[in-house]
């Protein structure tokens, strides 16, 4: 019988032996529990060197889907940039040097925009420090910094700023122009009202201002506002002409991960990706640079252009003239398409893409079920048409990021109902379910001091197959082993570029 496969990726669903604050453990999820207990299952590495990140670095959705789709370890933004800084190549990068030179030639400013974080998921503070060391001796610099509070603890910006302000004392050419939370400046669900507030601050206009960056963040903490939700504020110590974005300025967006940088990039530098124009208009003749390639954005230049990843999982399916479906809600749609396909936007032969709209709520603890039922409804209507379906459920990650433990438990329990529907449908229709995750999150929601945890983890993730005629090797394995395993299961030849091994063991 011709085999059909569903690969279900539970975003942020890690496994931990620690029970305290573990929403995965405490949620009533009989369907998921049964899959892991009763079927072939192996625990996969989803962080650090096993997925192309520095040792001990937490995994993330972008890297996770890249490795799953590539069938090999993919060295991405963080490791690549770190290595360039270490070798000194960073300081000779021609794109960075051109951004500096253009600002000097135009008697203009160089703006650095990005996430102020050591989380290493979207950006890293070390890269900001390196950029300042490179450019500050040569040109006036303005920093527009977004607080994190998701990929690190909710209130880390103050201590990070304290150290940063000491560093800046040696660089008199550098000022912090604006501060704000990623909730405003790094949305990815077209909530343009939020982006407008952050963008207007970059233009020099906000109802909030600061004279002391550290004190401004502390005042937010006093009002129970964490880094993520810091209201965009402008520097009140200087005239706005000293920090506001102007015509002919240079801009470096130092996030290396694209999904939460695209919308602000569109506000700054017109693209064809979105049908939206900022109310205040755009500045002219910007030299706009992105650290990595941002899907759908065509900047003036890219500091580290993408390296091609040939023969991805999706390409192998297409080359074999098989039909495939990619399905997720808005929040994770790019992950099962762009990232899964090696960091490129591509429409493969016999491929269908389905995006289910994410719910319009301020934070997902307000609707922890998210769009999991809508995704499942769409899935069950279409899946029989396809040989391979790749699905993402966002609940464990997106609700996990809110730090709301009770809501995360609710989200997992709502998700489990849909998982049971999928299991039943797959059994009735002879579809093999492979279930995994891209990284951990929901299994660590409360720390030992009973503080909420909002960031990803370094825990392993499950990889389950519902075909009991096979088994899975229990040796050390990672996300990169998933594609080779499913290709072997489908009887398809693994391409040479896909260097990870299949974990498949046949019992027959």
From Swiss-Prot:
What InterPro entries does the record tag this protein with? Alkaline_phosphatase_core_sf, BPG-indep_PGM_N, Metalloenzyme, PGAM_B_sf, Pgm_bpd_ind
In the UniProt entry, which residues are flagged as the active site? Answer: 61 (phosphoserine intermediate)
Protein residues bound to Mn(2+) 2: 11, 61, 438-439
Q: Cofactor binding mode, per the note?
A: Binds 2 manganese ions per subunit.
What is the top EC class of this enzyme, as a single word?
isomerase
Binding of Mn(2+) 1: at which residues?
A: 397, 401, 456
Chain positions recorded as substrate binding sites? 122, 150-151, 182, 188, 257-260, 332
Record's GO cellular component terms: cytosol; membrane
Q: Which reaction does it catalyse?
A: (2R)-2-phosphoglycerate = (2R)-3-phosphoglycerate
Q: What is its EC number?
A: 5.4.2.12
Q: In which pathway does it act?
A: Carbohydrate degradation; glycolysis; pyruvate from D-glyceraldehyde 3-phosphate: step 3/5
Record family assignment:
Belongs to the BPG-independent phosphoglycerate mutase family.
Q: Fill in the subunit field for this protein.
A: Monomer.
Function field: Catalyzes the interconversion of 2-phosphoglycerate and 3-phosphoglycerate.
Q: What is this protein called?
A: 2,3-bisphosphoglycerate-independent phosphoglycerate mutase
Organism whose genome encodes this protein: Mycoplasma pneumoniae (strain ATCC 29342 / M129 / Subtype 1)
């Amino acid at each position: 019988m011709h085999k059909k496969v569903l690969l279900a990726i539970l975003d942020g669903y890690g496994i931990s032996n620690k029970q305290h604050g573990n929403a995965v453990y405490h949620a009533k999820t009989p369907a998921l529990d049964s899959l892991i207990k009763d079927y072939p299952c192996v625990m996969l590495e989803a962080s650090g060197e096993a997925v192309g990140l520095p040792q001990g670095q937490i995994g993330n959705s972008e890297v996770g889907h890249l490795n799953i789709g590539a069938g090999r370890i993919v060295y991405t933004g963080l490791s690549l940039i770190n290595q360039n800084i270490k070798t000194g190549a960073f300081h000779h990068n021609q794109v960075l040097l051109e951004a500096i030179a253009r600002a000097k030639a135009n008697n203009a400013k160089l703006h650095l925009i990005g996430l102020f974080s050591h989380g290493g998921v979207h950006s890293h503070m070390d890269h900001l420090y390196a950029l300042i060391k490179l450019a500050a001796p040569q040109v006036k610099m303005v920093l527009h910094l977004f607080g994190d509070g998701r990929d690190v603890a909710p209130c880390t910006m103050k201590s990070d700023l304290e150290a940063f302000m000491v560093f800046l004392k040696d660089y008199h050419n550098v000022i912090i122009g604006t501060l704000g939370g990623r909730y405003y400046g790094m949305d990815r669900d077209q909530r343009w009202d939020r982006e407008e507030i952050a963008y207007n601050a970059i233009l020099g206009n906000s109802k909030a201002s600061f004279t002391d960056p550290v004190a401004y963040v502390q005042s937010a903490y006093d009002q129970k506002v964490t880094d993520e939700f810091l209201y965009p504020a402008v520097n009140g110590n200087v005239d706005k002409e000293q920090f506001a974005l102007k015509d002919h300025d240079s801009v470096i967006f130092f996030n290396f991960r694209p999904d939460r940088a695209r919308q602000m990039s569109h506000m700054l530098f017109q693209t064809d990706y979105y049908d939206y124009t900022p109310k205040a208009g755009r500045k002219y003749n910007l030299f706009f640079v992105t650290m990595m390639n941002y899907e759908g954005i065509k900047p003036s230049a890219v500091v580290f252009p993408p390296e091609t990843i040939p023969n991805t999982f999706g390409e192998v399916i297409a080359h074999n003239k098989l039909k495939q479906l990619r399905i997720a809600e808005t929040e994770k749609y790019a992950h099962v398409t762009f990232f899964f396909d090696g960091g490129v936007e591509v429409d493969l032969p016999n491929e269908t893409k389905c995006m289910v709209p994410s719910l319009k709520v301020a934070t997902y603890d307000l609707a922890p079920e998210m769009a999991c039922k809508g995704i499942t409804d769409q899935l069950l209507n279409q899946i029989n048409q396809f040989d391979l379906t790749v699905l993402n459920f966002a609940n464990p990650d997106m609700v996990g990021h809110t730090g709301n433990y009770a809501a995360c438990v609710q989200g997992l329990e709502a998700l489990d109902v849909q998982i049971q529907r999928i299991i039943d449908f797959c059994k009735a229709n002879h579809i093999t379910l492979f279930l995994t995750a891209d990284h951990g999150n929901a299994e660590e929601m409360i720390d030992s001091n009973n503080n909420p945890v909002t960031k990803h983890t370094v825990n392993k993730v499950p990889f389950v197959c519902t075909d009991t005629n096979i088994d899975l090797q229990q040796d050390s394995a990672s996300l990169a082993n998933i594609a080779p395993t499913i290709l072997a299961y489908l009887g398809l030849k693994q391409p040479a570029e896909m260097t990870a091994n299949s974990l498949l063991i046949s019992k027959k």
